[in-house]
Swiss-Prot record:
Family the entry assigns: Belongs to the UMP kinase family.
EC number in record: 2.7.4.22
One GO cellular component, as annotated: cytosol
Name of the molecule in the record: Uridylate kinase
Organism: Janthinobacterium sp. (strain Marseille)
GO MF: ATP binding; UMP kinase activity
Keyword presence, Transferase: yes
Domain of life: Bacteria
Gene: pyrH
NCBIfam families registered for this protein in UniProt: pyrH_bact
GO terms classed as biological process: 'de novo' CTP biosynthetic process; UDP biosynthetic process
Catalytic activities: UMP + ATP = UDP + ADP
Gene3D superfamilies on file: Acetylglutamate kinase-like (3.40.1160.10)
Upper lineage: Bacteria, Pseudomonadati, Pseudomonadota, Betaproteobacteria, Burkholderiales
Catalytic class of the enzyme: transferase
């Protein structure tokens, strides 16, 4: 068997990815398929941490939050990520994968608090760590949480799972001539105004020299191919 390209990775999942074809919430078939993909990577011996969004349940910047205090709306979004994290961990448990949910906000009866040395210990033991509640602060996205946690745990790369199979020169849904970049530098992405992550998350990854791989979570086997270092998605690097 070929050796994986990475030993420790941070996977960023959007909450919307859990919806499947449903208008909101968690689609069971979709989460089971995601867990199967994660299981394939875990079997390779790759240490895997996950940050998940909450947009399938609530978004602090969504129309439903209009008129609401932004900080309050963001806290509600953090709670949504805890719900998603619990669902993901439970789906993993049912197929024999040991996962630990660690929250940036204290909900100790439900999940344990995020403590960096403990998270590192879990990863070294071969457990999957799911980081919930974003950064624990309002006004920061879960993309920023992914960049932050990835930096903290010494991940070699942030894997940003999306609905498109990489970064394109233009919106592929609108422009038939849009081309996918196999690799692109952080500075090139900025100069071309390409939306990879929000500005705070992107700047943190660039400053920490933490590469980002953008790939499609809906494409079968894509996660494993990314971890094996194959030509899948777009690599954003220094």
């Amino acid at each position: 068997m070929t050796t994986p390209a990475y030993k420790r990775v941070l996977l960023k999942l959007s909450g919307e990815a859990l919806m499947g074809d449903d208008p909101y919430g968690i689609n069971r078939a979709t989460i089971e398929r995601m867990v199967a993909d994660v299981s394939e990577v875990a079997k390779l011996g790759v240490e895997l941490a996950i940050v998940i969004g909450g947009g399938n349940i609530f978004r602090g910047v969504a129309p439903g939050a209009q008129g609401m205090d932004r900080a309050t709306a963001d806290y509600m979004g953090m709670l949504a990520t805890v719900m998603n994290s619990l669902a993901l961990a439970d789906a993993m448990r049912q197929v024999g994968i040991t996962a630990r949910v660690m929250s940036a906000i204290a909900i100790e009866q439900v999940v344990e608090p995020y403590v960096r040395p403990k998270a590192l210990q879990y990863l070294e033991e071969g457990k999957i760590v799911i980081f919930a509640a974003g950064t624990g602060n309002p006004f920061f996205t879960t993309d920023t949480a992914a960049a932050l946690r990835g930096s903290e745990i010494g991940a070699e790369i942030v894997l940003k799972a999306t609905k498109v199979d990489g970064v394109y020169s233009a919106d592929p849904n609108k422009d038939p001539d849009a081309t996918r970049y196999a690799t692109i530098t952080f500075d090139e992405a900025i100069s071309k105004h390409l939306q990879v992550m929000d500005a705070t998350a992107f700047a943190l990854c660039r400053d920490q020299k933490l590469p980002i791989k953008v790939f499609s979570i809906v494409k079968p086997g894509a996660l494993k191919r990314v971890v094996m270092g194959e030509d899948e998605g777009t690599l954003v690097h220094v």
